[in-house]
Amino acid sequence: MSSDSFDPSRTPPAEPEGIVRQRIRVTLRMLGSLLLGGMAIMGSVLVFRQGLLPLIDTVFQPGPAWLSVCRRAGIILVAIAGYWAYVHWHEKRKATELQLQPVALILGGVGGAALVALPIAMLFAFGAYELVLFRGASPALLGVAALIGIAATLEELVHRCLLFRLLERAWGTVVALAVQAVLFALPHLENVAHGGPGDIVAMLMSVTVLGLLWGGLFVLTRNLWVVAANHAAWNFTILLTGVPLSGIEDWRAVAPLESRYAGPDWLTGGIFGPESSLLAIVSTTVVVVLLLRAARRRGAFFKAAA
């Protein structure tokens, strides 16, 4: 056999070495940007809570109620300011994803409430959930609603505006959607730590689908407030019905309705609540498919960085 004859063992790799190095560089650059952006957001919140908030309390002495309002409003404002500063100084662009779009925001909120209200209504109709008592609204409900809104906005700021965008720029839309959805689900393991394997599997499935839902909505709208409104409305609607919200039992005491679940876990969602119900998972998956198809038709999908 001549030296220049074909030898399978000498077949070059599927990807040239230069492309591999380029992908490694892109990934490292993405990780560096992610670290910097995370530090900008979390650092701003830390400075506010440890420095500015105690100063406000000392100088103005607003009292516990108003100090709580300042804390909640301040956390959102400084987190967004930190993100804006990161985008402005590091990415050197306008943070268009922070622009308010009132009509789209309202539609996002209504859509989030309707999307989870439908399977919950079906669960009540099937007898899987039972209404025990109508308590009416309590003053504490407003405070919990504010916490839900803050948590939803912060989660979307970190997971969609920062994490997803940077993943998308490095690896493309499809891979970024999948990775951020899984990373969104993993922190929720703590909420079902006292449950069984079935609760854990159902939670991972349901929250991964939710990560795809809000990731897909961000791909379609490229707007923080639309996605945050959808997320917050989803959570608040669950709270109103008196069933567990993402495995959190504490807030059920302030819900206008007192409810209990009486069906099998695959139908009720078990300890995690209706988000892990098969009905909610299926209906949300259908909406995810529709969102991603609409986003693709708009040309909102991007390939990995070269």
Locations of the language-model features?
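Juxtamembrane helix-loop-helix connectors linking adjacent transmembrane helices
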Residues: 4-13, 25, 46-69, 88-158, ...
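Aromatic-anchored segments of alpha-helical transmembrane domains
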Residues: 39-46, 116-122, 181-191, 232-241
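Membrane-interface helix/loop boundary segments of multi-pass membrane proteins
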Residues: 13-20, 154-179, 183, 190, ...
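Residue-level signature of the transmembrane alpha-helical core
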Residues: 109, 113-114, 145, 149, ...
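Residue-level recognition of membrane-helix boundary sites in multi-pass small-molecule transporters
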Residues: 104, 175, 225-226, 276
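Juxtamembrane helix-entry segments on the extracytoplasmic side of multipass membrane proteins
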Residues: 133-145, 193-206, 274, 278
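N-terminal, membrane-interfacial amphipathic/helix-forming hydrophobic leader that caps
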Residues: 1-95, 238-306
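Functionally important transmembrane alpha-helices
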Residues: 201-266
